[in-house]
Amino acid sequence: MFYSFVSLPEGKMSTRKGVVVYLDDLIDEAIARAYEEVKTRRTDLSEEKMREIARIIGVGAIRFNVIRVQPEKQFVFTWKEALNFDGNSGPFLQYSHARACSMIRKAGEFKRSADASKLTDESEIRLAKVLAKFPDIIESAAEDRRVHLLPSYGHEVASAFNQFYAAVPVLSAKDCRDERITLVDCTRIVLRNVLRCLGMGAPEEM
């Protein structure tokens, strides 16, 4: 699949004018910037682990930032967008996946439950509905060659999940703990599959 021109904030790239960014340099810069972010956020991690996570984030940030745009459209590449942990970006999806993994680890044993009648909060219902769209999104992306649907859907899942996380207690829930943890686990699985389909790593901690 071919993509249109990618520009920099300074303007369009041009080999004639010497305004060129090589992919290897772009990847190295992405990893370096991701490393600084990880080092700030996770001082508890070993140097080796921080660099491992930084590589996953850096490479994924570039892939996501390109794939999220329709192939026929030009776009301007900026580090602020590509490495934004809270926006429409690869790191946001990866961070949401890592958060779900962390919650599952902390939950310990739980009984998988599909009793949707216990999920009555608006944030729970919205997340469940978004997750249910995954098979249709995959089919449309494959059949119509609309790969940009996957990053858009992944962002929708991550946003719904973080709203759910902020709205209701999960690990400390009483009558619906199993149902909510099951919803978290379903989110983890869907985000992992979206990331893998995009050729991105799915870190379990960030």
For the regions a protein language model found, what residue spans apply to each?
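Non-catalytic interaction-recognition regions
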Residues: 1-206
